From Swiss-Prot:
Name of the protein: Glucans biosynthesis glucosyltransferase H
Predominant location category: membrane
Pathway: Glycan metabolism; osmoregulated periplasmic glucan (OPG) biosynthesis
Lipid bilayer topology: Multi-pass membrane protein
Alphabetical list of Gene3D superfamilies matching this protein: Spore Coat Polysaccharide Biosynthesis Protein SpsA, Chain A (3.90.550.10)
Length: 643
């Protein structure tokens, strides 16, 4: 009862790589498409209301904005009752401003989660004629499946492609698809291995003339440039292209339904699926995997319900109309130096915004299962990836004001930017929240009553401060609660997740671990924001996808300073008052225990032990499509000669 995949007995094992002298990979005849760079200073929104926009979309968005405003207004009114009696000082004004912004942030997530919960429970939200319960449609057009790669393990990569290829073949419609491995690899030994493993794959599945390999000599503009190069060379032959990631696996059934959705809706430019995170082995990966399974649909259905035909693009596991992409998604180079200037890093948001500006509808179909990806195995790997995303999202500050964008597209970018600024804002809120009673109550170590922030706040507001805390925690944790309720209402999913009790224990443990890691994430995200603002570029490295194996020296280098700071802060707080130390306890404990917490959650044996106990379970393999039997993580590790 888990999301771990084991190889199918019927799967042909990949032979070991014994040499690097592969034959020359083939490519189809070129069919160029012009893909001009878009001008961000000129342009207008071509179609304001899309034909495929769901009915009542204005009412839905009014609910989101109005619900967010109403919830925030109530919380601000209670906060004012805490601050107002003695007048509002400068520090209290700063506290109030931060509180308004941060509470509005979580209130918007709360409103989306409520909408998503209603949609999930009602089994609603299906659109574009894509119904997974109906017979598989017959396709009329050709589609290219693109798998970009950058210094990845070729055997792992192409095991995933084999899984997809065989699953598409099982639908009986393989003749409508071609498969492309688009390599941006810069390491020669990996590039040579890619060619060899590619040829082995073609021989094994008889994929010559249908599976193609192309390696760029100049990997300009990273993944966005990789895909754009393919569009300019081969895009004219394919009305649709399905973008994959190096760890993506999709079922043939899902792929065929996505293509049919594009064929039947000629004004749709993109359909984004909700990838389920699978193959987690470490404790960290398994808790992320479980959370994505239980809470993820609640959030995703809410987002899809409110965004309508202006949904976003996540860069992979999505199908795109090739001509629309070529006409409108050519990314310009941003003015200025890195990290804000240069090539657009988080290209997916910008490509979606430009395609919507060009008049194309953008949809998300979270109910369509059969779309999978893998998550980072450790918190460290997540934060390394998050640092790149931080730079890419902050770079959107140069794009959000582009002419002609739909206001929902601008909101996507502002939310991405805000996600990273909330980390330092939470830190400031906590520091000011402690600083106000210190400044107002004074520090009298010899007094009869020790200093207590709780006594200060309660005394100033007749207990209203505690209601602010309760309200904030409820709004923060509501998506987890709603996810659990939705799980209880789905007996099949509930059994697959270990039953009501084990699922509740899993949610509780995930919440505790997330709370312990929250100060670490807050600190490192804040540092990432300041590094980007200071002009430090994140670079571009291959993502770690194997089980975490973190050495103690590496852990001390990464988290030693944070641990020392947490212990120091705890000692100072205790010297002032034990009550102050208790008030700051969650942050102090998270920082002080960062090394053991990261180490524990990075262990495979810890994750597997909890799996055997029925904790952090997701539906068992037997309920999943056969394509899950050959995922990237099940391929034998590739060993090559580095010389």
């Amino acid at each position: 009862m888990d999301g771990t995949v084991t190889p199918s007995p019927t799967t042909t094992a990949m032979p070991p790589v014994s040499a690097l002298d592969a034959g020359t990979p083939t490519l189809p005849p070129e069919a160029p498409l012009a893909m001009p760079e878009q001008n961000l200073r000129e342009g207008s929104l071509q179609v304001r209301h899309q034909r495929t926009s769901p009915p009542g979309i204005g009412v839905r968005r009014f609910y989101l904005i109005g619900g967010t405003f109403a919830t925030t207004a109530i919380a601000v009114w209670v906060m004012l009752s805490v601050l107002w009696p003695d007048g509002i000082s400068v520090l209290e004004g700063c506290l109030l401003g931060l509180f308004v912004l941060l509470f509005a942030w979580i209130a918007m997530s709360f409103a989306s989660a409520v909408a998503g919960f209603v949609t999930v429970v009602a089994r609603a939200g299906r659109k574009l004629g894509i119904d997974p319960e109906q017979p598989l449609p017959t396709l009329r057009s050709r589609t290219a499946l693109l798998m970009p790669t950058y210094n990845e393990d070729p055997r792992r990569l192409l095991a995933g492609l084999q899984a997809i290829y065989e699953s598409v073949a099982e639908t009986g419609q393989l003749e409508h698809f071609d498969f492309f491995v688009l390599s941006d690899t810069t390491r020669e030994h990996i590039g040579r291995a890619e060619e060899l493993v590619y040829n082995e794959l073609c021989d094994r599945v008889d994929g010559h003339g249908r599976i193609f390999y192309r390696r760029r000599a100049d990997n300009a503009a990273r993944k966005a440039g990789n895909v754009a190069d393919w569009v300019r060379r081969f895009g004219g032959s394919y009305p649709q292209m399905l973008i994959l990631d190096a760890d993506s696996v999709m079922t043939g059934d899902t792929i065929v339904r996505l293509v049919a959705g594009m064929e039947n809706n000629p004004d749709v430019g993109l359909i984004q699926t909700l990838p389920a995170v699978v193959n987690g082995q470490t404790l960290f990966a398994r808790m992320q995997q479980f959370g994505g399974r239980v809470y993820g649909p609640i959030i995703a259905f809410g987002v899809a319900l409110l965004h309508g035909a202006e949904s976003n693009y996540w860069g992979h596991n999505a199908i795109i109309r090739t001509q629309a992409f070529a006409d409108h998604a050519g990314l310009p180079s941003l003015r200025g130096r890195k990290p804000f200037g240069g090539h657009v890093l988080s290209h997916d948001f910008v490509e979606a915004a430009l395609m919507r500006r060009g008049g194309w509808a953008m949809h998300m179909v979270p109910y369509l299962q059969g779309s999978y990806e893998e998550g980072p195995p450790t918190l460290t790997d997540l934060l390394i990836r998050d640092r790149r995303w931080c730079q890419g999202n902050l770079q959107h500050a140069k794009v959000v004001s582009a002419k002609g964008l739909h206001w929902i597209s601008r909101m996507h970018m502002l939310i991405g930017i805000g996600h990273y600024f909330t980390a330092p804002m939470w830190g400031l809120l906590m520091l000011i929240g402690i600083g106000i009673p210190l400044a107002g109550g004074g520090i009298d170590l010899a007094g009869d009553l020790p200093f207590s922030p709780a006594r200060y706040w309660h005394g100033s507001s007749q207990g209203n401060a505690i209601w602010i805390f309760i309200c904030t925690m409820f709004v923060l944790l509501a998506p987890k609660l709603l996810g659990y309720i939705a799980l209880l209402l789905n007996p099949r999913e509930l059994r697959a997740c270990g039953g009501a009790f084990r699922a509740a224990v899993s949610i509780l443990l995930e919440t505790v671990l997330a709370a312990l890691m929250a100060p670490v994430v807050m600190y490192l995200q804040s540092r990432g924001v300041f590094e980007v603002l200071a002009g430090k570029d994140s670079g571009w490295d291959a993502q770690v996808r194997d089980d975490g194996k973190l050495s103690w020296p590496a852990l001390f280098r990464s988290y030693g300073g944070l641990t020392v700071f947490g212990l120091f802060m705890g000692a100072v707080a205790y010297a002032v008052s034990p009550a102050l130390a208790a008030w700051m306890g969650p942050v102090i404990v998270g920082m002080a225990l960062s090394i053991p917490v990261v180490a524990l959650t990075s262990l495979r044996r810890t994750g597997m032990a909890l799996r055997r106990a029925g904790i952090f379970c997701i539906p068992k393999n037997s309920t999943r499509p056969r394509c899950w039997c050959v995922p990237p993580s099940c391929a034998a590790p590739l060993r090559w000669n580095r010389r």
